[in-house]
Amino acid sequence: MIRYFNYECAQEEALELAKNSLLDLGYKIDLMAPEGYFMVTKMQGVKKDIRQYDFRIAVLVEDRVEVIIVAQRKVFKRDSETSIGGKDLIQTEISDKLPYRLQRSIFYPINNEFTKNGLVKVEDITFGAND
């Protein structure tokens, strides 16, 4: 769940462009490390069917701008045990895979906003591919 973008400016400026793009989309920045060219947004929740997914966006600026979805899903446990208050009925699992439809709904607005701000999406990241 990674997308890559090329940039033709300084690393600091590319990080600032990415930050402003995410802020324009309504994300809130949780952690920003300008000296490491890295930032992470606050956790956001989204429902798909009966599952709830929480995700955050991580951005790392190196040779390219890497946009990564870090996600976890909440799963309803169907155990025979009962709990008072129901707090143990939901289990959180780290998920490195989100449904494709959900990935698209997250990445499409980011792609559009980054492109509008001068960051160009890399279509082919394989070795030997022309930039």
Region annotations inferred by a language model:
Residues 1-131:
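Ser/Thr-rich, low-complexity intrinsically disordered terminal regions
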